[in-house]
Amino acid sequence: YITLIQWWNKNATREGTHLYIGQDVARTMKADQLTRKMLYERSLSKVKGNCFWPANEILWNNKGVADSLKRNYHRYPALIPAYTHLHNRAPQEVKKLKTEWTAQGYMLHWQAEQSKTNPELASYFVIYRFENKEPVNLDDPSKIVAVTRETNYLLPYDDGKHKYRYVVTAV
């Protein structure tokens, strides 16, 4: 395992290459391996993440892997790293961001051109929530409340006593 990952890390030399390590949860994941694997992979410069399969093993929480991932490694949503070697411009910004009271609660709406294939246009949107006077920091994944392809989002409504600021980015 270590020899193979070191080889891939060394040989993934093309500029902008993203290296994701495949993990067969059912056949190769022993209970004590996850921590060692995750820490080692995160120490390598080219490794950008993991791909766990089969997906149902994660859904079934085989060997407690899903719990461990949520608790220790993936507490917050993650965005796919930008493929800047393919396209280095961000999609057009969202426009006309507004809230509206509906029968379901407060709904956040915005406008944006979308495309699954044109990188100039949004594929999906990331919604961040900040305390009213908190500085906006889009590098803080704990502030992500949703990732969606829709151009609206039902806001989580706590008790009406806290004011929040929402930011929507096009990705």
How would you name each of these model-derived features?
Residues 65-120, 160, 171:
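Pro/Thr/Ser/Gly-rich low-complexity, intrinsically disordered linker/stalk tracts
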Residues 138-146:
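Local beta-strand/beta-hairpin segments that build beta-sheet-rich folds
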Residues 155-171:
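Beta-strand-rich modules
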